[in-house]
């Protein structure tokens, strides 16, 4: 009985439509705790800065490279994470990532030189962070549709609660056991990411009209079936138990469906290599032809400058202004609590229909830019407290939604989200590598910690400009009318009723003559 239940929990969930719940709630809980042990730890790493500077006798900018390399590897290897996820599934990739995170953090506790931390935390843990975070947020978006914004926003508050808990807890722990054993303890805690990864059951969405059908094979496969009507092939999926029979009576329906709807290849059912000779592309680079996506990736590139540095430098800034270290650590906790309210509030707003989510995001980016500039004018504890609350709430509105917004039709849509997320996070790697060292360089030259926030504010201002161009590009301001492809409208068409039809992902069933013209033999 136990073995049977274990097998059921490991198999894929098959739905006729996006469930907006079900096992998705377990996936959401897993995402919450993965956020705790990934971004939560990264954003709380500032509590170790002064200890590392004293132990290694290094400058602030050199210590900043630890997180810079970590963030760079985490974002630079995003396409690799996408490829491995499409090949081996979300569960194995996330569990492997959890192991890498823990190994890197534990190894860092034994480091004798700062460059050893560049390798352990920067490269090893950074790779693990990528393998753990990106597949989780992708599969969570597949389990939800109408509730996607709200669920993702609430689940992403894990990093906020981690910042609130870790900053004072690690500060107190260091006083009793030292920073090395504190790092070791954090590394052991991060093994829980493997448990969360084990709960990520794959999901398959199949049409309600064809209960035994899986997403279509490419057109060449349909042509092959038409030429070999006596061929009967069964494809069994170990995970889902779904069987596809290509008998002659099924071939016409498959051909008709090929004319009516074009399904993205990455959504096809994944089968074992010995069962299928044709695979969907592991990474779809066609999204790079979409100008709205290019603008959105530039937004992510510049916005990353303002995401990490404030949480790294708020404690040193407070100490430099004469604030006691315990009270300075409380600033980071306050920022985390404000971020919780920002994420939940943003989820409630974006969950309303109809609403243009990209515009709400733009308003929040502008306000976040203002909050970063405000840090440079703070001179005492309560001024920093006010800035921390403002910044935390604004970064919360963006931090929990900027990746899920890729699933919106204003950017790329849910079908291409897996590849888009990989490329998007990859582009962020440049500023993830340069951001903290640039801020640290400004601090080393001026000896004023508030200068670190100038580079963050400048990057966020550029991000606002790029985000403002996303919607005009999707409407056709910068669009080449011959660059797009017709795709299914499905449930997404209602969200873009005011966009010209040339730039809609249209239902080919309504344009049947055109579909027949495109069905050339391969």
Curated annotation (Swiss-Prot):
It catalyses: taurine(out) = taurine(in). Its main location: membrane. The modification Phosphoserine is found at residues 234, 237, 240, 247. It is a multi-pass membrane protein. Residues 43-62, 113-118, 171-184, 320-329, 379-380, 444-451 are extracellular. One of its GO terms (cellular component) is basolateral plasma membrane. InterPro entries: MCT7, MFS, MFS_dom, MFS_trans_sf, Proton-linked_MCT. It holds the Pfam family MFS_1. It comes from the Eukaryota. GO terms for molecular function: monocarboxylic acid transmembrane transporter activity; taurine transmembrane transporter activity. Gene3D superfamilies: MFS general substrate transporter like domains. It is found in: Basolateral cell membrane. The chain crosses the membrane at residues 22-42, 63-83, 92-112, 119-139, 150-170, 185-205, 299-319, 330-350, 358-378, 381-401, 423-443, 452-472. Residues 1-21, 84-91, 140-149, 206-298, 351-357, 402-422, 473-522 are cytoplasmic. Monocarboxylate transporter selective for taurine. May associate with BSG/CD147 or EMB/GP70 ancillary proteins to mediate facilitative efflux or influx of taurine across the plasma membrane. The transport is pH- and sodium-independent. Rather low-affinity, is likely effective for taurine transport in tissues where taurine is present at high concentrations. This is Monocarboxylate transporter 7.
